[in-house]
């Protein structure tokens, strides 16, 4: 063991040996939020912790061009964990990594770095940012090792076995995540058939973003052991509820919830109201990151409990931002538009940047809306000055490009690649011939 190793690295090497780990996965995410990894034998752990592991960034979506592709994975010691579902003698552990370039400089296209940078901006203002996402997902049957959209069960909201036949899958996911350090608060069947939700305790935004990636990775891996496909696709089936990732956010200052004011209107502080005002002002641009695919916009339509109108409320779940009833240290704002296809690092960074802009510029939100917005006609919405979220990926990207605050938050590299991905996805979708078109036109014409 090298004498130059830090005390933390030395402790981890002893832990890896004690855990009898044979392989280590060095994980990171691309701009789209897809988890990537390099697997190394445990004997390479010392090198990984002290020097990092080089890889080819040109092969990763949105990372680097081939002529400047050498990149370094630096494991974050705080993210060490065994993968509980990998049983047997060949135990596997993982680290989540930061991505660097030559000279140990942070790579500006690393989503984790984008969030770290934004959290540092908040810290300069005295704030820490906590988030608590609620991830919904579907469990579908597999056929010939390929995922289908055939339901595993016919359960509904809060149903139990035998109607909820995927209870065992959720149980094993909960047990695995608990072993990985999650504090699980609840698990249940969701509204749609074969749709589920597992909730874990909120935490600082970086830890929570790491956990979102881990949650999806673990859920998919364990579902596969049951011969099922877990999908976090926003709208896999038309005509039923899609999957969301409602995200609760709050700021703390000097260890106290900065959103709570017992003497404020609705017991909300000016900080809370400014944060909400900032989120509302930047909502259209945030949508490009929080709803990152063509499919995402098929969820953001009226009638399926997904927000599509830019408004806020204390109780109203048809609003984009809802302030739950709890006060004191639990005071928070729930941002309801994100879906679980999003990159959590970029989404949390944009939420925070928008909120901080609201605080800096004292952006007061409009009056809260306590009416079911889905039941209002366009004239009534116009009178209340309630605008709509973008209706497509291309539209939301156009709003992002006009939003100086969020473009500065994400950085040129990320914005340019999000735009490139938008154009590529939009063209691909536009040129494809869809089953709907065949059903509609083939026999008639």
Spans of model-derived segments:
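Glycine-rich, acidic/polar active-site loops that bind/position phosphate-bearing ligands
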Residues: 2-445
């Amino acid at each position: 063991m090298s004498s130059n190793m830090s005390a933390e690295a030395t402790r981890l090497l002893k832990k890896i040996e004690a855990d009898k780990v044979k392989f280590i996965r060095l994980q990171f995410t691309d701009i789209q939020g897809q988890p990537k990894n390099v697997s190394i034998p445990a004997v390479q752990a010392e090198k990984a912790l002290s020097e990092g592991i080089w890889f080819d960034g040109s092969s990763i979506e949105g990372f680097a061009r081939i002529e400047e592709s050498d990149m370094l994975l630096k494991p974050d010691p705080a993210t060490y964990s065994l993968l509980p579902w990998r049983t047997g003698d060949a135990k596997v552990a993982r680290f989540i990594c930061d991505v660097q370039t030559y000279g140990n400089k942070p790579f500006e296209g690393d989503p984790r770095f984008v969030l770290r940078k934004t959290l540092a901006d908040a810290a300069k203002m005295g704030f820490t940012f906590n988030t608590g996402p609620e991830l919904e997902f579907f469990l579908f049957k597999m056929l010939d090792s390929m995922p289908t959209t055939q339901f595993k069960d016919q359960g509904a909201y809060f149903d139990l076995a035998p109607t909820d036949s995927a209870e065992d899958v959720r149980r094993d996911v909960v047990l695995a995540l608990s072993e990985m350090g999650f504090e699980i608060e609840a698990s249940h069947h969701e509204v749609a058939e074969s749709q589920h939700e597992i909730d874990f305790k909120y935490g600082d935004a970086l830890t929570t973003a790491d956990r979102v990636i881990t949650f999806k990775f673990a859920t998919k891996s364990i579902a596969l052991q049951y011969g099922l496909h877990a999908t976090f696709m926003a709208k896999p089936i038309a005509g039923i509820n899609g999957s969301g990732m409602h995200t609760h956010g709050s700021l703390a200052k000097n260890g106290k919830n900065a959103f709570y004011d017992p003497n404020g209107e609705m017991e909300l502080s000016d900080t809370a109201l400014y944060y909400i005002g900032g989120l509302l002002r930047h909502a259209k641009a945030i949508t490009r990151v929080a709803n990152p695919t063509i499919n995402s916009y098929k969820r953001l339509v009226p009638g399926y409990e997904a927000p599509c109108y830019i408004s806020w409320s204390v109780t109203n779940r048809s609003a984009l931002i809802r302030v739950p009833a709890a006060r004191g240290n639990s005071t928070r704002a729930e941002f309801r538009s994100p879906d679980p296809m999003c990159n959590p690092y970029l989404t949390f960074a944009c939420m925070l940047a928008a909120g901080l802009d609201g605080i800096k510029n004292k952006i007061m939100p409009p009056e809260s809306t306590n009416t079911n917005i889905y039941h209002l006609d366009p004239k009534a919405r116009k009178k209340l000055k309630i605008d709509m979220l973008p209706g497509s990926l291309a539209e939301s990207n156009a709003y992002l490009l006009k939003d100086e605050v969020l473009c500065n938050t994400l950085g040129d590299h990320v914005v340019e690649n999000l735009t490139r991905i938008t154009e590529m996805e939009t063209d691909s979708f536009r040129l494809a011939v869809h089953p709907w078109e065949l059903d509609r036109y083939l026999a008639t014409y």
